[in-house]
Amino acid sequence: VGHSELVGEIIRGVNVSALSRHKIMLPPRFSMVQVWPVRLPANHPLLTGQRRTALVANTSNMPVAAREASIYTGITLSEYFRWAEALREISGRLAEMPADSGYPAYLGARKHFPSVNWLISYSKALDEYYDKHFTEFVPLRTVGMLSNMISFYDMARIKADYAQLLEDMQNAFR
């Protein structure tokens, strides 16, 4: 590492099994179109900027679409880091730790979930259908929401808890 390879020199050996070993060699008249960055040995310290750098690289002989995709990948990474830095700054000014999803941890305890838009909720969109076909469902659902599972008998509470666990495990966006 840190020196140039000569033509025909064995660069690296890879053990495939106990009986065979592949040797990686630099072939004659091999032109390296790209200059690959190689980290210097450990006695040279890293720059501090390298610890905070995300590098998206491609080669000049890649198709245009692949080069364009790497540009958009870099833009996406930079926007994510900018968003994360803004969250850290806001949390620092409010003297609170950010939660996993980016919202303060106390919002769930207050029953406030900013990721849920209350204005376009479809939870009661089927009330007319249930009133027409299943007349007993809407009052039972209202009673169930009001009682908050306290008045359910044990087996129904176990089923509801099991359904909630299944929903939590299957839904990755919660």
UniProtKB/Swiss-Prot annotation:
So what does this thing catalyse? ATP + H2O + 4 H(+)(in) = ADP + phosphate + 5 H(+)(out)
Instruction: Name the Gene Ontology biological process terms.
Output: ATP metabolic process
**Gene Ontology CC:** clathrin-coated vesicle membrane; cytoplasm; cytosol; lysosomal membrane; transport vesicle; vacuolar proton-transporting V-type ATPase, V1 domain
Q: How is its activity regulated?
A: ATP hydrolysis occurs at the interface between the nucleotide-binding domains of subunits A and B. ATP hydrolysis triggers a conformational change in the subunits D and F, which induces a shift of subunit d. The c-ring is subsequently rotated and results in a continuous proton translocation across the membrane.
Top-tier EC class: translocase
Query: Keywords in UniProt for this one?
Result: ATP-binding, Cytoplasm, Cytoplasmic vesicle, Hydrogen ion transport, Ion transport, Lysosome, Membrane, Nucleotide-binding, Translocase, Transport
Name the Pfam families on file: ATP-synt_ab (PF00006)
Q: What is its EC number?
A: 7.1.2.2
- GO function terms (MF aspect): ATP binding; proton-transporting ATPase activity, rotational mechanism
This molecule's function is given as: Catalytic subunit of the V1 complex of vacuolar(H+)-ATPase (V-ATPase), a multisubunit enzyme composed of a peripheral complex (V1) that hydrolyzes ATP and a membrane integral complex (V0) that translocates protons. V-ATPase is responsible for acidifying and maintaining the pH of intracellular compartments and in some cell types, is targeted to the plasma membrane, where it is responsible for acidifying the extracellular environment.
What is the name attached to this protein's record? V-type proton ATPase catalytic subunit A
Q: Where in the cell is it found?
A: Cytoplasm; Cytoplasm, Cytosol; Cytoplasmic vesicle, Secretory vesicle; Cytoplasmic vesicle, Clathrin-coated vesicle membrane
Please give the organism. Mesocricetus auratus
Listed under subunit, the entry gives: V-ATPase is a heteromultimeric enzyme made up of two complexes: the ATP-hydrolytic V1 complex and the proton translocation V0 complex. The V1 complex consists of three catalytic AB heterodimers that form a heterohexamer, three peripheral stalks each consisting of EG heterodimers, one central rotor including subunits D and F, and the regulatory subunits C and H. The proton translocation complex V0 consists of the proton transport subunit a, a ring of proteolipid subunits c9c'', rotary subunit d, subunits e and f, and the accessory subunits ATP6AP1/Ac45 and ATP6AP2/PRR.
Cross-referenced PROSITE patterns? ATPASE_ALPHA_BETA
**Membrane topology qualifier:** Peripheral membrane protein
Q: Which family does it belong to?
A: Belongs to the ATPase alpha/beta chains family.
